Amino acid sequence: MEQDEIYGEFAYVYDEFMDNIPYEQWHDYLHGLLIKYGVTDGIVADLACGTGTMTKLLADDGYDMIGVDMSYEMLDVARQKYCCQDFDEIPYESESKSDSLKDAMEYNAQEQETGESKNEILFLNQDMRELDLYGTAAAMVCVCDGMNYITDENDLLKVFEKVKIFLDYGGIFIFDMKTGHFYENILGSRTIAENREDASFIWENEFHKDTGINEYLLTIYSLVDDENDLFERSEEIHHQRAYDIKFVRDCLEKAGLSCLEVYDAFTENAAKEDSERIYFVAQRHEKKTILA
C-alpha cells in the first residue's frame, strides 16, 4: 500500500481514537512559537492538517488558515466538522488549480475587508511534496508528526523547497518530528488495541533501526449495520521515518530556509538525545536588496 492510500477508512474514526491527544496544549505551544517569531496575523498554511483540529484552533486565533492534506477522506471529515455551514461559496479543491485558489483566497480577503469573515478555512486536497498555493503565506506549520510521513530524503528536500516558494520573505515554518528515541525505546514493537462502541482498531508497530523507518499495520473494524451488529474490516500500512537533526538542518538550508531553533517539544529547551518529539523553527531567507 502506498502512502497516498493511508487515512482512508481510518479517517472516519480518527478523531474518536485520537481523543486522548491534548490538542489545546499543543495549540498553545504552537501559537506561542508563532507569536515569538513575529507571526501575529495573516495567512498560515497547515500542512498534513488531517481532520483540521489544529487548523480550526489557529483560525480561532484570527489567522487566515489554509488546511492542506493528501487524504480526501481526512478533509471530508474536516469539512463536515467546520465547513458545512456558511461555506458553500468557498470551493474545496481536489486539484491544484491556481485560478480556483485565487478565487477562494480573494473571497476570504474580501470578507476580511468587510468585517464579515468568520475565520473560514480553505481546505486543499494536495500532497505537500507538490504544494501549489496562490501567493505566499506568513507562516506554515506541520504538526502531529505529519513530516515523519515523508520517508524519502529527496522528498523531504522537495517539501522544504515547496515551503520556501510559498512563504513570504522572512516567513516562518514550524514543524514537529518524532525521534528515533521515541520509535525505538518508547513505542518499540508494541501492539496497541482499542475497542469503542462503533469501531475498534489494532495498531501493530515495527521499528527498523537501520533505515529509521517505523511501520504501522493498522486494522480497523467499523460498524456498518447497527441493527445486525455488522462490522467492516479494513487495513492500512503506515510508514514514518525518524531523521537525524543535522540532516534536517542541512536539508532546510539547502532549500533556502534558515533553521533558527530545534526545541524539545513543548519546552523552550534545546532538543536532546532523549527527546521524544522535537520542533523545528525555520525561516525563509530575506530578499536581498541590490544597491545601484
Annotate each predicted stretch with a short phrase:
Residues 143-145:
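Residues lining the SAM
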Residues 157-169:
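A short glycine-rich, Lys/Arg-flanked "PGG" loop and its adjoining helix->strand segment in the class I
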Residues 239-292:
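C-terminal lobe and adjacent flexible extensions of AdoMet/dcAdoMet transferase-like proteins
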Residues 132-139:
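A short acidic, Gly/Pro-enriched loop at the edge of an enzyme's catalytic core
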Residues 45, 53-130:
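Class I SAM-dependent methyltransferase SAM/SAH-binding core
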Residues 48:
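Conserved S-adenosyl-L-methionine
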Residues 1-42:
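Conserved class I S-adenosyl-L-methionine
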Residues 174-249:
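SAM-dependent methyltransferase
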